[in-house]
């Protein structure tokens, strides 16, 4: 089984909400994945195509007519599926893709509006992002998957897991959300956030990205990530943010069958 390679699995039950949440450490064979080689020259890696790792780049068309880009390495019908976070792309998974593809079939997906996927989605939602992931997995006729989501990719893989049912063996949240007790914002609060984002897009984006880093973060790496986030079209960033803020997390987690 795929999950046998994970060193530690924590299952936390939030009794007050009667929901399940899986928090799984990224430990393989009892050792942390090392990114030291990546950190030696992170910008060179981030600017290099994932195909250099032996991945094949393919795409499908989503239900709403958006081209969804993904990368795959391996032929097993049991796979690790990586989903990036807000304003990111599959390239951000470079060290993990390099490491895990040595022993597993690995897939990395660019959700709509991100990476090399299409920009023509009309309405952004977590359901739509989850459907992007689901569509790739069903297109490849995979039998069993471990879904791994970074940051915003966490709620995206929850949506995908609900679509996939028994095909999903585990969900792995990497630096994703931990306060899942709220149902999402609406009304005035939603309007206020969207208005502020429209008026102060660049400064709000820069401030939020700067909060990602610590004092020891490589300056070139921080600059690359900041500039990459600012390249995203405003309507996509705003639509994605709105999807994040309006998702009903407790309801989605209750639906998990894992």
Model-derived regions: residue spans:
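Alpha/beta-hydrolase fold catalytic core
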Residues: 8, 13-80, 103-104, 143, ...
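Short, hydrophobic alpha-helix immediately C-terminal to the catalytic nucleophile
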Residues: 94, 134, 158-162
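Short, conserved loop/helix-junction motifs that constitute active-site signature segments
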Residues: 100-101, 253-257
């Amino acid at each position: 089984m795929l999950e046998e390679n994970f060193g530690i699995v924590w299952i936390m039950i939030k009794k007050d909400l009667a929901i399940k949440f899986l928090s799984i450490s990224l430990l393989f064979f009892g050792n942390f994945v090392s990114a030291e080689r990546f950190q030696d020259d992170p910008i060179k890696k981030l600017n290099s195509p994932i195909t250099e790792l032996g991945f094949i780049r393919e795409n499908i068309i989503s239900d709403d007519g958006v081209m969804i880009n993904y990368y795959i390495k391996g032929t097993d019908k049991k796979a690790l599926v990586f989903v990036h976070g807000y304003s990111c792309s599959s390239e951000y998974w470079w060290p993990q893709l390099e490491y895990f593809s040595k022993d597993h079939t690995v897939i990395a997906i660019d959700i709509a509006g991100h990476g090399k996927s299409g920009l023509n989605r009309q309405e952004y939602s977590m359901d739509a992002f989850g459907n992007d992931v689901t569509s790739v997995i069903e297109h490849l006729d995979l039998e069993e998957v471990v879904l791994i989501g970074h940051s915003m990719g966490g709620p995206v893989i929850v949506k995908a897991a609900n679509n996939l049912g028994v095909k999903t063996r585990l969900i792995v949240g990497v630096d994703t959300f931990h306060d899942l007790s709220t149902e999402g914002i609406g009304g005035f609060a939603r309007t206020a956030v969207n208005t502020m984002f429209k008026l102060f897009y660049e400064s709000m984006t820069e401030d939020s990205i700067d909060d990602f880093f610590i004092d020891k973060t490589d300056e070139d790496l921080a600059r690359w990530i900041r500039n990459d986030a600012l390249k995203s079209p405003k309507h996509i960033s705003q639509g994605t943010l709105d999807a994040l803020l309006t998702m009903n997390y407790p309801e989605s987690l209750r639906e998990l069958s894992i």
